[in-house]
Each structure stands twice: as structure tokens, then as C-alpha cells.
Amino acid sequence: MRSKYIVIEGLEGAGKTTARNVVVETLEQLGIRDMVFTREPGGTQLAEKLRSLVLDIKSVGDEIITDKAEVLMFYAARVQLVETVIKPALANGTWVIGDRHDLSTQAYQGGGRGIDQHMLATLRDAVLGDFRPDLTLYLDVTPEVGLKRARARGELDRIEQESFDFFNRTRARYLELAAQDKSIHTIDATQPLEAVMDAIRTTVTRWVKELDA
């Protein structure tokens, strides 16, 4: 079986870290043990510096980061990660488990920020070509639930401090995109933890077994 790229998506507080652990456990039970883990933005020395710039409230002092500058920093970090980490890992037969990928930009910047969706799609295609995750698990929570969990973790980053309206628009775009793409599987992450974990196990197990069919 060829190596695959699995991405976990969702609003802040959706439970991506727990989901990643369940994905890893499930893959190991299916005999897949050669894995690497990525996060976006980040995952390389350059991408981590860009992460600090785009997410740290104090990184540029009082200067306002424009919406388009924000998008371009996300894509700069993303293409660096894809070309230097993800693609080489996949070529070597290693599975890649990612915390966020391009769907985040389409939802947060296209939905939350209201940036032209055609422009974002064009930019994605120019930067990434036809490279896409093989499977995306979208953990769906309301902003009220997700941000309550995020705030319980401690200090919020620049984007986590956006308004409920911003996150409602982001969630709506996530759901819209998930409905259009069969590779995106929506998990109701407002359920009790064990139910969410079971849903992830079932989804990943069924998907991997279909690869072997």
C-alpha cells in the first residue's frame, strides 16, 4: 500500500490533538507504523518563523497584518512544508499525519476573512498544483464549544481572539467545502469524547480497508 497523507481540521478547541492520537493508534492497529507528524503553519525552521509572525499578537508590534499578507504567509509556510517534508516522506513510503492544511486557509481566510474564494483557489493551485491530502477529518464544533475549550488551555493567539461571527463564517465555509469533497469526512466533535474517538476509528479503519479492496 502506498503511503498516504491524512489531515485533521477544525476550529480552535475541536480536539485535533486527541484526534491525531486516535488516528495514530488506529493506523498502528492496522499495521501502519512508519509515520511523521506535521502542523500548519510550521513544521520546518522557516515555516515555524512564519508561524510566529502570523499568529503571535506581538510579533509585528502595532502594525496591522493585512488579510492578503496573512494569506501569503500561510502559503509560504505551507509550500515550504510540503516540498521539504511532506512530499519527501510520502516518496519514502512514510505516512504523514497533519494538523491542518489548505482547507484551513479556504475556511478561515475564505470564510472568516471573506477573501475572494476564486482568488484563494487560484493561489492554492499555483502554489500546490494538484497536491491534496488523501483523507481529511474535519472535526465540527460550534464556536461556542470550541472557543470555550481553547480558552481553558490558556492564552489565545491572534486568530483565536477573533469574534464569534468570524468563527461562525469559518465553520460555515468548512461545512460547505466538506459537502463538496468526498475526501473530507465530517466528525461531530460536540459528542462525548468516547463517541468522537469511536467515529474517528471507524472512519479511518473503513477508509484504509477500502484502499486494500
Curated annotation (Swiss-Prot):
InterPro entries: P-loop_NTPase, Thymidylate_kin-like_dom, Thymidylate_kin_CS, Thymidylate_kinase. Keywords: ATP-binding, Kinase, Nucleotide biosynthesis, Nucleotide-binding, Transferase. It holds the Pfam family Thymidylate_kin. One of its GO terms (molecular function) is ATP binding. One of its GO terms (cellular component) is cytosol. It catalyses: dTMP + ATP = dTDP + ADP. GO terms for biological process: dTDP biosynthetic process; dTTP biosynthetic process; dUDP biosynthetic process. Signal peptide: none annotated. Its EC number is 2.7.4.9. ATP binds at residues 10-17. CDD domains: TMPK. Phosphorylation of dTMP to form dTDP in both de novo and salvage pathways of dTTP synthesis. PANTHER family: THYMIDYLATE KINASE, UMP-CMP KINASE 2, MITOCHONDRIAL. NCBIfam families: DTMP_kinase. Belongs to the thymidylate kinase family. This is Thymidylate kinase. It comes from Escherichia coli O157:H7.
